[in-house]
Amino acid sequence: MTQANAAQGMGSYILFTVAGTTYALPSDAVRHMEMVEDVTRVPNAPAFIDGVVFSRGQVVPVVNLRVRFGFERAAFDLRSRLIVVQSDGRLIGLVADAAREFVRIPPDAIQPPNEALTGMSGRYVEGIASMGDRLVLILSLDRILNFAEALTVGLAD
């Protein structure tokens, strides 16, 4: 197999951290990343919704992944990133503690999550990749966004 053919079989992901754990999302779902700035609070929003931001000409709801996964809220800093993703034509911003890198992960390095994986973040995990000496939890964007669905519908009205 040539190097080009091997690369075609690999999935491209963006790695980011939340509460010290490395997570990944497929890079084709990520529209762009930016610093977290000027979040406008929304009355009566669920605790995991920080509010909305104006990003590249559009109002985007902001989901705080720390809170969504059951971790303690942390103040934004220079490393905090808003990862703007698109699903079903909707843009949603996901706040991460830091965005690390874009990587390619071969399919054989990804295993399904163990049934014992529990907790708030466990329900969103689609797979676990072994990358050298670290494990990366690959998230299901659909599962994360299904939880935020009611809010995005409400904000769009």
Across the structure, where does each feature detected by a protein language model lie?
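An acidic, low-aromatic, low-complexity terminal/linker signal
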Residues: 1-157
